[in-house]
């Protein structure tokens, strides 16, 4: 397998459909056109032609599009064949194309990878293609499109350019100490560094929003049996996702629902009631419940309000609270307010949010929805926003740490070489986002998660 091979893949989803598309990229795409179509179509014009087998018989007929490189998605010669979407027809056409020497099936994401390697896209834009395909809401799709069009990359490149100018100034002062460049008296370096750090903080804040929009928040509903966990899942989901009975321990396994609150994706997980297991099936369900709790972004501690008047989670169930991960945020949900007559709404107890509601009637559930949105700092007005991945957040955080360390050098003993090194490392972290400095292993992991024909 060589990166110089001409590659082919189906660009439409597998299965039956009105249209099926095969995409070919590489220097032999021209030969494919001449062999299968009998001619080379006019560049960037749709041509309706028969697709022929080796013996001259017609396999299908459809539209052929020819994009000679470098003016194509991948930067190479690209041919697209748009025929009927039957799997048998597409398979016959694909087999015909693969009889031509030098062609092979594309790896997942290889078309986008070639676009990146040929400077048609930077890495953040290439990732945005997959994010746009996987978008689960209108807001996520718009933000992914913004990233694909370069919104995120432009912000990162602006930071990289600012760091370049700052490094030039610092390193000139180090290399030419006899020149009249005084770091401390004019304050230029500190002022420029503060500007870069402020811009970086703004990008980090937007990236956290973009990551939340892409990844969603994992919320686990946990508590004793018959506290109303499954009823709350149904209320949040707006449908009967879980079986609800008066029998304690009805839920034996993990149930998952994917919902949106004003565009924010939420992964709601209902778990088995926590108690001493009565049988092996329940024991496994409780083990899985704790596994989900340990991986949660937030736990909704469900309390049956008819069984206790306590509101402090440490008082309600100290053993449960003691077992939770130290920094895991919890929200206490006192359920069955329709029976207890408690006042609906939210308050705070010892640093924990406390919400009184009725999962059965739905009263107070909107308060919980707003709380979940606000607890993650989600901004529903993200016009011009972009999507971000975990690796982007890590790169931005590392860049911020290097700038903080560089500023400490500047304001402390003034070690010019150490400041210059911190600036270089921060610039490298930022450049990893767009792919200016990226290892081959990382590229492989990123593009292998793409669709085959992308």
Curated annotation (Swiss-Prot):
Q: Which residues bind K(+)?
A: 226, 245, 247, 250
Which cofactors is this protein said to need? Answer: K(+)
Which terms are listed as keywords in the entry? Cytoplasm, GTP-binding, Hydrolase, Magnesium, Metal-binding, Nucleotide-binding, Potassium, tRNA processing
A molecular function GO annotation: GTP binding
Q: InterPro entries under this entry?
A: G_TrmE, GTP-bd, GTP-bd_TrmE_N, GTPase_MnmE, MnmE_dom2, MnmE_helical, P-loop_NTPase, Small_GTP-bd
Q: Where does GTP bind?
A: 226-231, 245-251, 270-273, 335-338, 358-360
The residue ranges crossing the membrane are none
- The entry marks the following residues as binding Mg(2+), namely 230, 251
Q: Quick one: where is this thing mainly located? A: cytoplasm
Cofactor binding note of this UniProt entry: Binds 1 potassium ion per subunit.
Gene Ontology biological process terms in this record: tRNA methylation; tRNA wobble uridine modification
Which compartment or compartments is the protein found in? Answer: Cytoplasm
> Which superkingdom, per the lineage?
Bacteria
Q: Which residues form a coiled coil?
A: none
Is this entry keyworded Nucleotide-binding? yes
Domain (TrmE-type G): give its ranges. Answer: 216-377
Q: Which residues bind (6S)-5-formyl-5,6,7,8-tetrahydrofolate?
A: 23, 80, 120, 454
Q: Which GO terms describe its cellular component?
A: cytosol
Q: Give the first-level EC class, as a single word.
A: hydrolase
User: EC number(s) on record?
Assistant: 3.6.-.-
- Functional summary from the UniProt entry: Exhibits a very high intrinsic GTPase hydrolysis rate. Involved in the addition of a carboxymethylaminomethyl (cmnm) group at the wobble position (U34) of certain tRNAs, forming tRNA-cmnm(5)s(2)U34.
Q: How does it assemble?
A: Homodimer. Heterotetramer of two MnmE and two MnmG subunits.
Q: HAMAP family from the entry?
A: GTPase_MnmE
Question: Family, per the entry?
Answer: Belongs to the TRAFAC class TrmE-Era-EngA-EngB-Septin-like GTPase superfamily. TrmE GTPase family.
Q: What is this protein called?
A: tRNA modification GTPase MnmE
Q: Which organism is it from?
A: Shigella flexneri
Where is the organism placed in the taxonomic lineage, from the top? Bacteria, Pseudomonadati, Pseudomonadota, Gammaproteobacteria, Enterobacterales
């Amino acid at each position: 397998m060589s990166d110089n091979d001409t590659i082919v893949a189906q660009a439409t989803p597998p299965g039956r459909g009105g249209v099926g598309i095969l995409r070919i990229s590489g220097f032999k795409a021209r030969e494919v056109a001449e062999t299968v179509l009998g001619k080379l179509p006019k560049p960037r014009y749709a041509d309706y032609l028969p697709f022929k087998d080796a013996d001259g018989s017609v396999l299908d007929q459809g539209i052929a599009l020819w994009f000679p490189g470098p003016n194509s998605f991948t930067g190479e010669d690209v041919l697209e064949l748009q025929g009927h979407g039957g799997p048998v027809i597409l398979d016959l056409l694909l087999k015909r194309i693969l009889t031509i020497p030098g062609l092979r099936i594309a790896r997942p994401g290889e078309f986008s990878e070639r676009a990146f390697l040929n400077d048609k896209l930077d890495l953040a834009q290439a990732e945005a293609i997959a994010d746009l395909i996987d978008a689960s809401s209108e807001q996520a799709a718009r933000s992914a499109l913004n990233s694909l069009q370069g919104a995120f990359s432009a912000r990162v490149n602006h930071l990289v350019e600012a760091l370049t100018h700052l490094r030039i100034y610092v390193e000139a002062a180090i290399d030419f100490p006899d020149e009249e460049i005084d770091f401390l008296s004019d304050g230029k370096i500190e002022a420029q560094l503060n500007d870069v750090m402020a811009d970086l903080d703004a990008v980090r804040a937007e990236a956290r929003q973009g990551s939340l929009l892409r990844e969603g928040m994992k919320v686990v509903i946990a508590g004793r049996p018959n506290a109303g966990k499954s009823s709350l899942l149904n209320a949040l989901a707006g449908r009967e996702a879980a079986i609800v009975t008066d029998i304690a321990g009805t839920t034996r396994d993990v149930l998952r629902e994917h919902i949106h609150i004003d565009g924010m994706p939420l992964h709601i997980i209902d778990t088995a009631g926590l108690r001493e297991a009565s049988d092996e099936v329940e024991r496994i369900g409780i083990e899985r419940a704790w596994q989900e709790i340990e991986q949660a972004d937030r736990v909704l501690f469900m309390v049956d309000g008819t069984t206790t008047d306590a509101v402090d989670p440490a008082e309600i169930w100290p053993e449960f609270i003691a077992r939770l991960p130290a920094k895991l945020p919890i929200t206490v949900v006192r359920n069955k307010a329709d029976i207890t007559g408690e006042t609906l709404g939210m308050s705070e107890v010892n640093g924990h949010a406390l919400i009184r509601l009725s999962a059965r009637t739905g009263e107070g559930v909107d308060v919980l929805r707003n709380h979940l949105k606000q607890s993650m700092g989600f901004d529903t007005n993200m016009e011009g926003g972009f999507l971000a991945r975990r690796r982007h957040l890590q790169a931005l955080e590392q860049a911020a740490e290097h700038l903080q360390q560089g500023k400490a050098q500047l304001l402390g003993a003034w070690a010019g070489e150490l400041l210059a090194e911190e600036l270089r490392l921060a610039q490298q972290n930022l450049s990893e986002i767009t792919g200016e400095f990226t290892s081959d292993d990382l590229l492989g992991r990123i593009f292998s998660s793409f669709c085959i024909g992308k």
